[in-house]
Amino acid sequence: MDSQVRQNYHRDCEAAVNRMINMELFASYSYTSMAFYFSRDDVALPGFAHFFKENSEEEREHADKLLTFQNSRGGRIFLQDIKKPERDEWGSGLDALQSSLQLEKNVNQALLDLHKIASDHTDPHMCDFLETHYLNEQVESIKKLGDFITNLSRMDAVKNKMAEYLFDKHTMGGKN
């Protein structure tokens, strides 16, 4: 049954929103994996664990916003299987941040692609929604991750575990 509230909402936009929901849930799932990896007793970096747990919750909120948007536009939600994260072991904090940066770049590209689909189908509501709730936030997240990676690299954190510990404690807010 078609929605009575649907107006100027192209089927391509609807399908792309469903794919974006899946990508946001995958990102949340990946960040959950990272969070609990860093809270393991043999890794024990609580600042990284907290940072990735917050990112997981943020990505889940992004998915929820898209689900709400889909319903408000009269679209239909078709959830897909959520892919397993690319790894179970995330290595050092630097390794995980590099994976996180790539994940955020992938999400950003998917959002830009979604914006293009909306623009191509003259959907100003979707364009405004993406610009208001997602695009700037993605750029800020990418910048923050890049800064973290630069600082950890500068401290040679892969070889210097004390640097990683201090970064976790002072930058990521880790408490024992």
Swiss-Prot record:
Residues the record lists as binding Fe cation 2: E59, E104, Q138
Designated name of the protein: Ferritin, middle subunit
Alphabetical UniProt keywords: Iron, Iron storage, Metal-binding, Oxidoreductase
Enzyme Commission code(s) on record: 1.16.3.1
SUPFAM superfamilies recorded: Ferritin-like
General function of this protein: Stores iron in a soluble, non-toxic, readily available form. Important for iron homeostasis. Has ferroxidase activity. Iron is taken up in the ferrous form and deposited as ferric hydroxides after oxidation.
Temperature and activity: Thermostable.
Residues binding Fe cation 1: E24, E59, H62
UniProt superkingdom: Eukaryota
Residue ranges constituting the Ferritin-like diiron domain according to the UniProt record: 7-156
Assembly behavior: In liver, forms a heteromer consisting of middle and heavy subunits. In spleen, forms a homomer. The functional molecule forms a roughly spherical shell with a diameter of 12 nm and contains a central cavity into which the insoluble mineral iron core is deposited.
Family: Belongs to the ferritin family.
InterPro entries noted in UniProt: Ferritin, Ferritin-like, Ferritin-like_diiron, Ferritin-like_SF, Ferritin_CS, Ferritin_DPS_dom
TM stretches of this protein: none
A family per Pfam: Ferritin
Example GO BP: intracellular iron ion homeostasis
Gene Ontology CC entries for this record: cytoplasm
Tissue localization of expression: Liver and spleen (at protein level).
One Gene Ontology MF term: ferrous iron binding
Reactions that this protein is recorded to catalyse: 4 Fe(2+) + O2 + 4 H(+) = 4 Fe(3+) + 2 H2O
